[in-house]
């Protein structure tokens, strides 16, 4: 489905091809149409509804934290990591979203998974880029249990790519594609 949505938004396929692809992937007609309707405003040439846009002030971290709060989340599970500083700074100004510190990325995903199962709410977590491989086993567990998780990872600035080659992944999405 991710590839179909990407192809639709990139104007590589038509609406008809998108719906046919969704049907081939065993989605019902109603589910395929619902998916199309949710991404239609992002197709080049489409008009964006006013309720899809808003003005924001602050940093990108503030925007991310505010978006998480708008989902009704109360907790953001975090692990140690250098790229998380701006988000943690933003949490100081947004006390309605409480950070829960995990000591390892794998534990972070397991804790967010357990929280989601116990509360019935989506678990949100964020970890540093080197933690992505460490977190993948528990991402697999959450995927198998169909637990709703939203996980964020920082990434190196493009001008710094390759300076810590032992920590860089060539394709971030490819590493976790089976679980998302």
Predicted regions mapped to residue ranges:
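N-terminal alpha/beta PP-like core and its mobile active-site loop of ThDP/TPP-dependent enzymes
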Residues: 20-27, 38-180
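Extreme N-terminal leader/targeting regions
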Residues: 5, 14, 22-28
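N-terminal secretory signal peptides
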Residues: 1-13, 39-41
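Exposed alpha-helical structural elements
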Residues: 3-4, 31, 175
């Amino acid at each position: 489905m991710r590839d179909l949505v990407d192809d639709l938004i990139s104007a590589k396929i038509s609406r008809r091809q998108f719906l046919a692809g969704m049907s081939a992937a065993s989605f019902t007609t109603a589910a395929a149409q619902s998916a199309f309707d949710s991404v239609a405003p992002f197709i080049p040439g489409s008009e964006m509804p006013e309720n899809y846009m808003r003005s924001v002030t602050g940093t990108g971290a503030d925007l991310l934290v505010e978006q998480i709060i708008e989902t009704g989340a109360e907790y953001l599970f975090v692990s140690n990591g250098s790229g998380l500083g701006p988000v943690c700074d933003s949490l100081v100004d947004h006390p309605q979203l409480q950070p829960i510190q995990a000591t390892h990325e794998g534990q972070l995903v397991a804790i967010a998974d357990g929280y989601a199962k116990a509360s019935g709410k989506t678990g949100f977590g964020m970890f540093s880029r080197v933690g992505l491989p460490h977190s993948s086993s528990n991402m697999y567990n959450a995927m198998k249990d169909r637990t709703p998780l939203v996980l964020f990872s920082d990434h190196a600035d493009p001008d710094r790519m390759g300076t810590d080659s032992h920590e860089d992944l060539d394709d971030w999405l490819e590493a976790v594609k089976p679980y998302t």
